[in-house]
A protein has these predicted regions:
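Single-residue recognition of alpha-helix boundary sites
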Residues: 14-15, 117, 161, 260
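A short hydrophobic/aromatic micro-motif that marks alpha-helical segments and, especially, helix-coil
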Residues: 18, 87, 262-264
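Active-site-proximal flexible loops/turns
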Residues: 10, 114, 263
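Surface-exposed beta-loop-beta
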Residues: 173-272
Length: 298
């Protein structure tokens, strides 16, 4: 057990990213292809009275992909990740967006929760909140629909409950996800939104009827999972989330509550876990935080 450990997050642990893009456009402007890529760095100096944590600097993830826009309202994206010497599939989807209606199919995030869905290119801190990592969303194969207007954003989707990297045989589970946002204040670039989301998933043989909730320290240098619960004999899972986001001038505030409940076979007790977080930021050097109304994320 690590006691009295101090992580100097603001000064001694630094998360950095470097990104690059190459864009090709047609003369008529009806086709555009962008090659995207970024590298994510992490470094830290740790002080501990008992547990020995090594000071280090590392490249913890590299992303490479392409985004293609065609026929005015269609977009396709393929992105791969190379973290810890392993190749993983990230966003692989095609979508149609007419401004108010968005249809998406492929390997992408379900419309549930907020923090863990924020892309690495848009992260505001060194890593995602522990609550978001443990109970938040994951990418799955499926289809979703989003309706968006000035004051309202409603999303829903149907997905496979199997991780795309899971090679186990057997019937896959399935999941239904939904998210509703209300923006009581929206003026120019300032916005306040409140929202709720829910997810219902049924585990299949391919998932071995097991669910794992885990999270570690807010640094990629520490691989240990300090919070971990393996829930076996799972029948189905309910998740619920509530969120608040405020982007006002240079200020940014985000808070979220997430809860997971697992119904298990009669021989064992059901599992319920929850958590919450709050984070605030202030943009320096004449900058400000942005907000995407379609995704409902700052």
């Amino acid at each position: 057990m690590m006691k009295h450990t101090l992580l100097i997050l603001m000064l001694l642990i630094c998360g950095m990213s470097a990104s690059a893009q190459l864009t090709l456009k047609s003369d008529k402007g009806d086709f555009e292809a962008r090659l995207i890529g970024r590298a994510l760095f992490d470094g830290g100096v740790f002080f501990s009275d008992k547990t020995s944590l090594g000071n280090a600097v590392e490249v913890y993830d590299v992303r490479v992909g392409t985004v293609v826009r065609f026929l005015e309202r269609w977009t396709g994206k393929i992105e791969m990740g190379f973290a810890k010497s392993k190749v993983s599939m990230k966003d692989i989807y095609i979508e149609y967006n007419d401004g108010k209606n968005l249809f998406r199919i492929g390997h992408c995030y379900e419309p549930f929760s907020l923090e863990y869905r924020i892309g690495t290119s848009d992260m505001k801190f060194n890593g995602a909140a522990v609550t978001g990592i443990a109970f938040g969303d994951r990418r799955r194969l499926g289809i979703s629909y989003t309706y968006n207007c000035d004051v309202l954003n409603v999303s829903g989707g149907v997905f496979s409950d199997k991780d795309i990297d899971n090679t186990e045989k057997g019937d896959e589970g399935y999941a239904f996800s939904g998210r509703v946002l209300f923006r009581p204040y929206s003026k120019e670039k300032n916005v306040i939104h409140v929202g709720v989301s829910s997810r219902f998933g049924v585990q299949g043989e391919a998932e071995e009827n097991k669910l794992t909730y885990s999270a570690g320290a807010p640094s990629n240098l520490i691989s240990e999972k300090f919070l971990k619960a393996e829930v076996t004999d799972a029948i189905n899972e309910w998740k619920f989330g509530a969120e608040v986001v405020m982007v006002l001038d240079r200020w940014y505030f985000q808070s979220e509550y997430l809860m997971a409940h697992v119904n298990r076979k009669a021989s064992v007790e059901n599992y319920t876990g929850d958590g919450w977080y709050a984070q605030v930021g202030y943009a320096l050097l004449n900058g400000r935080y942005g907000y995407n109304k379609t995704s409902g994320m700052a």
